[in-house]
Amino acid sequence: LPKMVSLLDREIGKLFAPRLLKPPVEWAFNNCVLRDNVSELPGSLKVFPYAEAPLNDLVDPNINKVTLCWGSQSSKTTTMYAGIAYLLSEFPKDTLWIMPSAENARNFSKGRWLPFIDDCAPLKSQCPLSAASGRVDTDKITNMRQEFLSCTLTFAGAGSENNVKSAPVAYLVLDEIDEIDPDIRLAALERIKGRREYKIIQTSTPKEETGGIWEEYLYGDQRKYFMPCPHCGDHIEFAWRQKDKSGNLRYSIAFDEDAKLEDGSYDFHKIHSSARYL
């Protein structure tokens, strides 16, 4: 009997033990897989060093808004959906994900996000199953709306205020905000109004020095990524090689037009085979 009581105590203790959470970067590497049709680095998601801090900020209770003011093809979208996958798996709450158009959203969801869910075990386990087939219920997991077991993710295009009007959400994603009308962004922000705990994740490549992502960046604490200089060892600001100290382009690269796909993504194999300096 004493052994039985001891075993019962241990099992009860497990039920009330605090959950051990892995940091987002480690979680992403263990659970997120990129297919070769969406990344030139297929396999387990290896987060670039400059993307680690934004991912970790998603679980910082003192941070409500994460702004990625990054250059094009710098892993903005990959970083973002790895972070969203983490939040939906570990801290599930209703989410609204807005893109410049409904077509953008539908193509992204169908071509990248849904396959990503299929390869991410924790997120796939949140998908309801059909009683008839035993497979993922395709009536609840659709291109524009995924009704997970613990929360709902809705995609929307920014073409009209009606598209972004939905029930209140805790997570709001604004993808490529420089392509989204400011009035639409304000309407979207109404979806988190009154929430004590919320996250706004917004990304874009800056186009102008006024408005858009650059203005949002200036509103924040303006973090930059520094790396050790390969020559002197001092930490220097990370910048793309094709720009000089004044920010001017030193050279540009051209590649075959068909390397850019209809959904706006790129076929890196075609880029590698056709790229040339100008």
Which residues make up each language-model segment?
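Phosphate/NTP-binding elements of NTP-utilizing enzymes
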Residues: 1-278
